[in-house]
A protein has these predicted regions:
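Substrate-binding cleft of secreted/luminal carbohydrate-active enzymes
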Residues: 269-347
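Chitinase-like catalytic core of GlcNAc-active glycosidases
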Residues: 61-78, 83-89, 93-261, 267-281, ...
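Generic recognition of flexible, low-complexity loop/linker segments
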Residues: 52-53, 81, 302-303
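Residue-level marker of positions within ordered structural domains that often coincide
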Residues: 29, 97, 320
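A general structural signal for short secondary-structure junctions and capping/turn motifs
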Residues: 2-3, 56-57, 111, 263-264, ...
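C-terminal transmembrane-bundle signature of multipass membrane proteins
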Residues: 53, 63-66, 340-347
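Bacterial Sec-dependent N-terminal signal peptides
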Residues: 1-6, 13-58
Length: 347
């Protein structure tokens, strides 16, 4: 049955790829993604493909996350539509999770129901701290506040921001959240610094732990440096542990980061490295590259291999949108990465 389903997916995927080449647009008017031609010309075959796709995703395979820039609320091209992402993605992480419009909500619903793609969003500790610092600086730079003290404590601010963001799950029916916290090593900290760091850890990851316990049906992925977290029990609750490796320059860098992360208390069977897609800026030859090769493809090859001390169960891709626009067909790098990790079984 597994072989049969995979061959159905492969065969129809070839047809869909052909139709996707025809539907690549270069106009700059607001557009709506066209339903692939095969869904109209042979709806029965397309329905079999979608059924096989969902069955495939419900089984064991390498997971793929894609970070998606949804800042364009009135898309000027198909590549800015949620519904245009590769069918074989498992999780789509929206970069702007608030104020979703009807089109976005409709597309989120469609890719989940038809293709089994779940939509998440990220809560990033560093960005919350940057927002707090910006608010504090703006307050202090305002001449009307001369002689006044900025009384908003960061810990209070952190709790409020994280809790408000988590409410987006129910507001917009997200399937879960990626919570990113770069815990710092406490080896060289003073006792005062250790206490302050543990307090922030306990707030951010404590909220994550409590939220997951109250929402067992939602997905929790944790990203950062798990080896530096004191209370590692939260990693038993999450489905995935994402290791950010955007700065990597080789497969060896990925292996090094994972080896550092997989310490006692960190499950070794939930590991997913996060790397960058190449930049849309053609002069940027570093982002998303290992020398002249693409980091996404190199990491996919690494994920496809067997490892003694841990399991790489998938791949996470930052700036996934950048891979859309190509002459031959859309999202070629992501499609190739998925094929590397989940090859068609030939019989």
């Amino acid at each position: 049955m597994k072989y049969y389903i995979q061959h159905i997916i492969f065969g129809i995927s070839v047809l869909l790829m052909a139709f996707s080449m025809e539907s690549c647009d270069t106009d700059h008017e607001p557009v709506k993604v066209k339903t692939p031609g095969i869904s109209n010309q042979n709806p029965e075959l397309y329905a079999r493909y979608l059924s096989g796709l969902r069955t495939y995703k419900s089984g064991k395979h390498k997971i793929v996350f894609g970070w998606f820039d949804n800042s364009e609320k009135i898309p000027a091209s198909q590549g800015q539509n949620i519904i245009a992402v590769p069918d074989s993605l498992d999780y789509l992480v929206l970069t702007l999770p608030e104020n979703l419009n009807d089109r976005e909500l409709s597309e989120m619903k469609e890719i989940k129901e038809k293709k089994g793609i779940h939509t998440l969003f990220e809560i990033n500790f560093i960005r919350i701290k940057e927002d707090y610092d910006a608010e504090k600086e703006a307050f202090e730079d305002n001449s009307d506040n001369a002689g006044k003290i900025f009384n908003l404590d960061f810990r209070t601010y952190l709790v409020d921001k994280v809790q408000k963001r988590l409410k987006l799950c129910s507001t917009f029916n997200y399937d879960g959240v990626v919570m990113t916290f770069y815990a710092k090593t406490k080896l060289y900290m003073t006792e005062k610094e250790k206490t302050a760091q543990r307090t922030l850890e306990n707030i951010f990851l404590g909220i994550a732990k409590d939220w997951k316990q109250r929402h067992p049906d939602k997905v929790l992925a944790l990203a950062g440096k798990p080896q530096n977290v004191d209370d590692k029990s939260v990693f038993d609750l999450c489905e995935y542990i994402i290791i950010p490796c955007q700065a990597s320059t080789s497969a060896s860098d990925i292996v090094y980061s994972i080896n550092k992360a997989v310490v006692e208390g960190v499950p070794n069977n939930k590991i997913i490295p996060l790397v960058s897609m190449y930049s849309k800026d053609k002069t940027d030859t570093k982002t998303g590259y290992w020398g002249k090769s693409l980091s996404v493809l190199g990491t996919a090859k690494l994920a496809a291999q067997q490892h003694t001390d841990y399991q790489i169960i998938g791949l996470a891709i930052d700036n996934a949108n950048n891979d859309y626009y190509h002459v031959r067909f859309v999202y070629p790098t992501i499609r190739e990465a998925i094929s590397i990790m989940n090859p068609i079984v030939k019989i």
